Amino acid sequence: MPSLKDLKNRIASVKATQKITKAMKMVAAAKLRRAQEAAEAARPYSQRMAAVLANIAQAVGADDSAPALMTGTGRDNTHLLVVCTAERGLCGGFNSQIARFARDHVRKLLAQGKTVKIICVGKKGFDILRREFASLIIDRVDLREVKKIGFENADRIGHKVIELFEKGEFDVCTLFYSEFKSVISQVPTAQQLIPASAGPVAAEADSASAVYEYEPDAAAILTDLIPRNISVQIFRALLENVAGEMGAKMSAMDNATRNAGEMINKLTLNYNRQRQAQITKELIEIISGAEAL
């Protein structure tokens, strides 16, 4: 049984930890608001960009003039996975959730006999995936020194992906990230980048009755648009990730603060009981000694 001094020290230690978790919760809450606004602002642009891409892609079709980033290599033997996670922890299961989602996809591809290459954006995903797939990781993007995610960060990743494609390093590229839904809900998401996929907006483009004319021509526009779209989609993924990370961190620190409060109450109760028992014992000894006299 711990002594009164040990219990007192533990109570003080838990109280100090509670102050830290409470402060981290408040910081995460402040950052969450800004991150959520940035993520929500990026969605319409990225969705509209994909819609425009789908419309122009329909005009070009399978024409020989269509850029390789849209048509692909015609194979799907080698897959490049760009996995976006956080640089830091203390955000519950946020990082493990997206890493697990990507890991399951890697296992599925390997079981099909495909070659897999991975680019890790964020330290935590890198730490998790390298335990099993260290030989598959070809690059790691370090954003620890980046205070605010900017388009230039996504653009560098996009250029790296396109450079690898032009060198014939892969056939299909898929982006993995956590889509922010709410403070307690972040959904692991996979989005194909190459060959350029219009995704759910393709149906919208199919049903559109408008007819567009393109200058100089649709293929030339696609050649410029697809690389930008890749960077835009990566940028949106990074912003969604930041919002999800802050939401998960705020929730985790809130739980930690409440758990610390419960632990303090239990330790204080235990401390008071032991102190009461000790005082009672001393009183009994005093009374017994007085009666003996």
UniProtKB/Swiss-Prot annotation:
GO biological process: proton motive force-driven plasma membrane ATP synthesis
Keyword Cell inner membrane: yes
Any Pfam family the entry gives: ATP-synt
Entries under SUPFAM superfamilies matching the protein: ATP synthase (F1-ATPase), gamma subunit
PROSITE patterns on file: ATPASE_GAMMA (PS00153)
One GO CC annotation: proton-transporting ATP synthase complex
Protein role: Produces ATP from ADP in the presence of a proton gradient across the membrane. The gamma chain is believed to be important in regulating ATPase activity and the flow of protons through the CF(0) complex.
Subunit structure comment from the entry: F-type ATPases have 2 components, CF(1) - the catalytic core - and CF(0) - the membrane proton channel. CF(1) has five subunits: alpha(3), beta(3), gamma(1), delta(1), epsilon(1). CF(0) has three main subunits: a, b and c.
Protein family membership: Belongs to the ATPase gamma chain family.
Name the record gives this protein: ATP synthase gamma chain
Source taxonomy: Bacteria, Pseudomonadati, Pseudomonadota, Alphaproteobacteria, Hyphomicrobiales
Gene name tied to this protein: atpG
